[in-house]
Amino acid sequence: MGDKQEISKILDSTVLQAGGDLTINTGLRAPDVIEIVKEVVASELAVYTREADKKAVERLQRFSEDLVEVLAKKVSDKLNRFNKPALQIAARDAALSFVRSGDDLDEKVLIDLLIERVSVEEHTTMQRLIDQAIRVVPMLSPACLDLLSLVVFRNLSYIGTRDKMVEWIRSMGAIIQRAPRISNLDIAFLSQADCVVSVPGITMSSRWCDYFLDRYDLIFRHPVPCDVSASFMEKFSMNCDNGSFAFDKAYWEKNGTIIESLSALLFHFDGTISFNLTDSKTLYDGLQKAGLDDFKPDFELLIESSQRFNCDEVRRFFVDIDPNWEHAITLLDKDSLLSVQLLPVGQYIGTRQLSRLMGREVPFGVFYQ
């Protein structure tokens, strides 16, 4: 009977398994997370010499404190999930990886992954994927992480306005600045680390120019010629005087909705028109939702009258935003990278890297819709 009661206590508690040492916790407070991380790693530290042990303990303390600081900021309501054995094992793997490397980048990436890990449901594919990412990240050099980020960026589609797209491209500055250090060995190693699969002789991705011309068919165009622009503005009772644009008041009151849709265009002082949206699908979807399908031919005429960029002009568009794009585009157009397809763990690690470095959330789910 006594044995059954003891078993009952264990079943109702948290079991920590660390190198054969079993510990039971019947409750968890937020400050206990540091002690949990230390405990699940403790038995592994025995392999270090006295001098190395001191450094290992310092790194473990730093990692634990930094983890709790970020947890408190981002997911303070989920701290008690550290009572779950699977999450403790993930924390153990992440902490040990940093103890071994002591690399600042490793710590940032691993803590970011643990924050994601705390937020997902157990026994899901996403949970398994994050656990795998925690094991894979310590194997990757900073150059490999940057390469994954670049490949993910190439595969993303941005929908919005011209200025926001420029801002989005510019936010890659820190990554493309380091692009020259990425080597063929980094590309090959991603296959060994199960982040990508390479199929030599088969192109899995379009070249940079072709992809952007196809995906963003409005941004990469020259302005609409003056005569076509003038006819368009005349139809919508617009006039331009010394760089100032005005609408006929009566026309505005009668056709307010169509006037609002003109925000998809940029009207220049020289009398030409450019497109303010990234692509024609977004433009036409907006017209349809506003009940303005009758005006679609007018916008189609603008598009047909404007000349598409050539490949050199597409490249120059990026380089004018940041000169480091020159090397990054050359890198991504290598045959060895065009034959690469991201595996889920590589896609996920690259997505988290982009989210962290760009300062905006890049949803992983968009790749699997």
Can you name each region flagged by the protein language model?
Residues 45-81:
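Short terminal targeting/anchoring segments
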Residues 165-181:
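Short helix-coil junctions and helix-kink-helix linkers
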Residues 160-169, 199-208:
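Short acidic alpha-helical/loop segments enriched in Asp/Glu that coordinate divalent cations
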Residues 83-138:
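Long, low-complexity, charged/polar intrinsically disordered regions in eukaryotic proteins
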Residues 1-50:
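Long, low-complexity intrinsically disordered regions enriched in small/polar
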Residues 123-160:
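Short alpha-helical segments that sit at the start of domains
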Residues 184-203:
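A short, conserved structural fragment
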Residues 207-364:
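Short, amphipathic alpha-helical interaction segments positioned at domain boundaries
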